[in-house]
Amino acid sequence: MSEFDLTTREGRWRHFGSVDPIEGTKPTVKEEMTDLQSTHKDFLFEIEEVGIKNLVYPVVIDNYQTAGTFAFSTSLTREEKGINMSRILESVEKHYDNGLELSFNNLEAVLHTLEKHMKQSSAGVDVSGKWFFNRYSPVTNIKAVGNADVTYGLAVAGDQVTRKELTVQATVTTLCPCSKEISEYSAHNQRGVITVKMYIDPSATLPTDYKEVILDAMEANASSILYPILKRPDEKRVTERAYENPRFVEDLIRLIAADLVELDWAEGFDIECRNEESIHQHDAFAKLKYRK
């Protein structure tokens, strides 16, 4: 039989090996503890970015609450050993209210708080999440929720924004022009994955629908858009539209670029289009970079 009372939680813990804490000699009061991170001497190099990543936190994107995955960083001078990383979460909490609403303005406010709280000259953030939006079937006009992946990137140095980026990843349908040309019947098609990274002019005024503008350039130039709900009239429309608009991966990336290059608030962009080939075991892809 056990020497402990197994009808109690504490007894079971002791039965499985738990012991009393020791009487330590090190301080237990914060003010008396050694703060190694705040050590000041010559540590040879300054650090451009140091912080935390893979922080999952509730965010709000266009009225939908979702999970955001964050990477926060600040600079670190040559004379400081380290940063107090707990202050990063404290800075985020100051702007949290049942979900941090994702916008460049809100993220900039968080970064300025972080700069001051960490007593550093610069700070940066990258945050990814699901963007949900209403999507209506093309003929029957039935509403459902579509989604795309978005990543905001922002950096500040003092009062200046030094980096402003938005990445959108969405899926579309692409129909093969070669297959259509050589086949007696129909053509093979597949799902295409498009990733667009926009480099935004920090001094420019963004339109309120900037995410929709980017998504439209991606989807409108594909063979067809993807829809959550399709009834038979919708499926007929989608199938025929794809056949009317065949796209090689090379065609798609150039057409998207032609739309994005017209945006006066963009300094440049990176695009990758990847087709998950339906008649091969490999994918097809194309990449394009453009700077104004």
Swiss-Prot record:
Involved pathway(s): Cofactor biosynthesis; 7,8-dihydroneopterin triphosphate biosynthesis; 7,8-dihydroneopterin triphosphate from GTP: step 1/1
InterPro entries in UniProt: GTP_cyclohydrolase_FolE2, GTP_cyclohydrolase_FolE2/MptA
An individual GO BP term: tetrahydrofolate biosynthetic process
UniProt-recorded Gene Ontology molecular function terms: GTP cyclohydrolase I activity
Sites marked May be catalytically important: 176
Keyword Cytoplasm: no
EC number: 3.5.4.16
Purpose: Converts GTP to 7,8-dihydroneopterin triphosphate.
Protein name, entry field: GTP cyclohydrolase FolE2
